[in-house]
């Protein structure tokens, strides 16, 4: 009897899984029946932009955390698919920091070519997953918004690829409830032009704080104040951008910081991170981990140690993205196809997790972290037939990216890198990022 595999989510990780199975089928392998459940009306996950916030057209929590004018905050050379280059997709090499629409088109191009859309049930959020140890089957309950019906089906494996950047972590501070300006989490941030002429407080010191603050600066915010809990971002910011230690409270429109300083602000943007949140999973199947490189309870970073018939994709903190999701998806595919044997001993799988955590914690150096994840990708690629690519070259692109950011945080996107797939150097974009106000694909591809 043919196995059945449920994939939850048709974002970059879920699409990688579909592509992995399609690749095996193309080579003559007998693959399971694949059903991918996607809550949105289209694929792409976070990259599927919507103007909506709060609830979507079906009354479901909006998944998208993307905003207008978003450009990649890392070089595309670090995420390029090994089996589908940017040059193949666009017919030429493109600059190194594409806007969201360009990356979405690239993601979509590969899965169109692979013809995997037939496996996806759109507008179909998963409501619940359960496991029966006697039958060794998962029961997945989903809702079809097109027919307004709820149904259940059984599967041999479940692959959770729902992501972990869609459920915001929203803190409360004294004075929030009486602040007369706008308070918005990064998840619901959509357009930097809303903050033109305003004094903006950006709470957080990670990538979303850096990028959203930069967007607001680019599109005319009067000033940016960013605050941090542990360490400042520390870049050479423009004159109207200041970093402060942790926010303590608000009185009226005045923000009070841990160093005793104050700042009047018109709007607050919470770049305070996201939660691993799986409302459709019972406690015994639900991953519980911090956002880190070595995820808790996942053997090889993907197989759930408490039930290794279940897998998770893309749950790590990420330097590598699309190509790491591919490496994971190919590995999971081969585990399901019986090409890779999982340890039968749970203790052995937990030991693997512990060893990865120990190695991650050995250094807090950024280069070490990048190399750590690169070694993880190499490990998975070596165990499958995923096309090998220059992973060390991708690391070099990341290292150069960090240098360029330190040199000029508002101009790092004007640099170019060499493709680790084709070896072609990216052209310099026709317009400096600070001046490129049109983020459309048509404008971007005019090189």
From Swiss-Prot:
Its cofactor is FAD. Transmembrane segments: none annotated. Its EC number is 1.14.13.148. Optimum temperature is 30 degrees Celsius. Changing residue 317 to A: Strong decrease in activity. It catalyses: trimethylamine + NADPH + O2 = trimethylamine N-oxide + NADP(+) + H2O. Optimum pH is 8.0. GO terms for molecular function: flavin adenine dinucleotide binding; N,N-dimethylaniline monooxygenase activity; NADP binding. Keywords: FAD, Flavoprotein, Monooxygenase, NADP, Oxidoreductase. FAD binds at residues 13, 38, 40, 46-47, 63, 73, 126, 318, 321. NADP(+) binds at residues 71, 73, 173, 205-206, 208, 229, 413. Pfam families: FMO-like. It comes from the Bacteria. InterPro entries: FAD/NAD-bd_sf, Flavin_mOase, Flavin_mOase-like, FMO-like. Catalyzes the oxidation of trimethylamine (TMA) to produce trimethylamine N-oxide (TMAO). TMA is the best substrate, but the enzyme can also oxidize methimazole, indole and dimethylamine (DMA). Belongs to the FMO family. The catalytic process consists of a reductive half-reaction and an oxidative half-reaction, via the formation of a C4a-hydroperoxyflavin intermediate. NADP(+) undergoes a conformational change in the oxidative half-reaction. PANTHER family: DIMETHYLANILINE MONOOXYGENASE. This is Trimethylamine monooxygenase. The gene is tmm.
């Amino acid at each position: 009897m043919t196995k059945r595999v449920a994939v939850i989510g048709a974002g970059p990780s879920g699409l990688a899984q579909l592509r992995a199975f399609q690749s095996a089928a193309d080579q003559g392998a007998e693959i399971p029946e694949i059903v991918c459940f996607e809550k949105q009306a289209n694929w792409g996950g976070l990259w599927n932009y919507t103007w909506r916030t709060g609830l979507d057209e079906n009354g479901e929590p909006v998944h998208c955390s993307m905003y207008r004018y978003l450009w990649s905050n890392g070089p595309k050379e670090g995420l390029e698919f090994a089996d589908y280059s940017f040059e193949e997709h666009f017919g030429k090499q493109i600059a190194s920091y594409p806007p969201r629409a360009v990356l979405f088109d690239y993601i979509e191009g590969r899965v169109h070519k692979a013809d995997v859309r037939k496996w996806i049930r759109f507008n179909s959020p998963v409501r619940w997953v359960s496991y029966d140890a006697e039958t060794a089957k998962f029961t997945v309950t989903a809702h079809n918004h097109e027919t307004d019906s709820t149904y259940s089906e059984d599967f041999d494996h479940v692959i959770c690829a729902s992501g972990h950047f869609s459920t915001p972590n929203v803190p409360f501070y004294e004075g929030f409830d009486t602040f007369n300006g706008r308070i918005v989490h990064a998840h619901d941030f959509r357009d930097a032009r809303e903050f033109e002429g305003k004094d903006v407080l950006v709470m957080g010191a990670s990538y979303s704080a850096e990028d959203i603050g930069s967007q607001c600066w680019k599109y005319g915010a009067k000033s940016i104040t960013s605050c941090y809990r542990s360490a400042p971002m520390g870049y050479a910011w423009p004159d109207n951008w200041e970093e402060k230690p942790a926010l303590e409270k608000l009185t009226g429109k005045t923000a009070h910081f841990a160093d005793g300083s104050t700042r009047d602000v018109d709007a607050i943007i919470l770049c305070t991170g996201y939660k691993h949140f799986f409302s459709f999973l019972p406690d015994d199947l639900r991953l519980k981990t911090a956002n880190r490189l070595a995820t808790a309870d996942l053997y090889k970073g993907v197989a759930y140690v408490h039930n290794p018939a279940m897998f998770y994709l893309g749950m790590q903190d990420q330097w590598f993205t699309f190509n790491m999701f591919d490496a994971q998806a190919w590995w999971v595919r081969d585990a399901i196809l019986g090409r890779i044997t999982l340890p039968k001993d749970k203790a052995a799988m937990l030991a693997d997790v512990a060893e990865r955590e120990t190695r991650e914690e050995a250094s807090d150096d950024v280069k070490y972290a990048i190399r750590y994840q690169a070694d993880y990708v190499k490990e998975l690629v070596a165990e499958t037939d995923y096309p090998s690519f220059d992973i060390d070259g991708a690391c070099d692109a990341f290292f150069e990216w960090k240098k360029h950011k330190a040199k000029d945080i508002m101009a790092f996107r004007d640099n170019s890198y060499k493709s680790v797939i084709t070896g072609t150097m990216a052209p310099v974009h026709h317009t400096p990022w600070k001046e490129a106000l049109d983020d459309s694909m048509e404008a971007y591809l005019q090189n």
